[in-house]
């Protein structure tokens, strides 16, 4: 029975060296060993396989591989190739040229995330980008549990503690269908605005938090009619259908505004200008691949954001 756990790389290389030079002396010279040392390596290898691997005919005195030896030599060559490839991959990972990076993006960012990932794949072709999308609360939880390496979001959280860098503008406003009574007004009266029905994401959404603060400040705590919906897409289609108004990231409705399906209302204090941030937890250093991706995202200067030049 072959004892695989007794086989070493040194033994395999000794076999390759002796078979290649046809002598113990030649093989020892190749490896910088003494002939007795290389003979010991081959003997141990033959004992591990349980069969002779080299044959030395008396008439020539040169070592030649047996059929079993040929099989082991071919395996040894494949092992060297695999180790060489592995060495390249390890170096690539350690230098940030390869690896996997999990990028978290808040739900609002799903409208530009594919473009960002495409740009990163061109800049870092050997780094695999895994995208993880969720609302603000989910993303903060992912950061705390180290489920993501980097995250693109609005206002950075207080906990967990993160390092952040601003990526680009993130405007918010109120949108309505083009035939809405408040559409086209130079300035929407506050009482008229607060009397409307608003469509909004559920609690935990960063946009919902910003909307609540804006309406509370505008109405001094006045209760506003609110209908919760599960996604920005549902909200957009509902506004287009005339079910109400919506306070949204203008990046979410860029196409609808461009094609006239929605209009932006001239409400007091709007648009609210926020920023997109790239964040990562400070309690765990970024791996080389994540550092590379971080640098590439910053270098893009928001070129992937809606409305940015193609």
Curated annotation (Swiss-Prot):
HTH lysR-type domain ranges (all copies): 7-64
GO molecular function, one term: DNA-binding transcription factor activity
Keyword hit for Transcription regulation: yes
DNA-binding region of this protein: 24-43
Keywords: Activator, DNA-binding, Transcription, Transcription regulation
Gene3D superfamilies documented for this protein: Periplasmic binding protein-like II, Winged helix-like DNA-binding domain superfamily/Winged helix DNA-binding domain
Keyword Transcription part of the UniProt annotation: yes
InterPro entries in UniProt: LysR_subst-bd, Tscrpt_reg_HTH_LysR, WH-like_DNA-bd_sf, WH_DNA-bd_sf
Domain of life according to the entry: Bacteria
Function of the protein: Transcriptional activator for the cbb operon for RuBisCO and other Calvin cycle genes.
Family: Belongs to the LysR transcriptional regulatory family.
Annotated protein name in UniProt: HTH-type transcriptional regulator CbbR
Chain's gene name: cbbR
């Amino acid at each position: 029975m072959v004892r695989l756990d007794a086989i070493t790389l040194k033994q395999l290389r000794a076999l390759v060296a002796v078979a290649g030079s046809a002598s113990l002396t030649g093989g020892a010279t190749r490896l910088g060993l003494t002939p007795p040392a290389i003979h010991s390596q081959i003997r141990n290898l033959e004992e591990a396989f349980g069969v002779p691997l080299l044959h030395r005919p008396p008439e020539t005195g040169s070592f030649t591989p047996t059929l079993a030896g040929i099989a082991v030599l071919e395996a040894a060559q494949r092992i060297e190739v695999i180790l060489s490839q592995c060495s390249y991959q390890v170096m690539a990972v350690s230098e940030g040229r390869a690896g996997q990076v999990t990028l978290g993006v808040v739900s609002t960012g799903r409208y530009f995330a594919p473009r960002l990932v495409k740009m990163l794949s061109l800049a870092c072709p050997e780094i695999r980008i895994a995208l993880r999308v969720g609302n603000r609360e989910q993303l903060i939880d992912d950061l705390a549990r180290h489920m993501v390496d980097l995250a693109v979001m609005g206002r950075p959280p207080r906990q967990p503690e993160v390092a952040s860098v601003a990526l680009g503008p993130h405007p918010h406003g109120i949108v309505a269908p083009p035939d809405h009574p408040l559409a086209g007004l130079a300035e929407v009266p506050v009482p008229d605005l607060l009397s409307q029905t608003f469509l909004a994401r559920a609690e935990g959404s960063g946009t919902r938090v910003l909307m609540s603060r804006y309406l509370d400040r505008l109405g001094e705590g006045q209760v506003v009619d609110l209908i919760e919906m599960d996604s920005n897409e549902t909200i957009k289609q509902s506004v287009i259908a005339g079910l109400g108004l919506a306070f949204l990231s203008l990046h979410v409705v860029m196409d609808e505004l461009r094609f006239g399906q929605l209009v932006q209302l001239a409400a007091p204090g709007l648009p609210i200008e926020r920023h997109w941030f790239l964040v990562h937890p400070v309690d765990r250093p970024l791996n080389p691949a994540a550092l590379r991706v971080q640098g590439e995202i910053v270098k893009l200067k928001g070129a992937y954001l809606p409305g940015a030049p193609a």
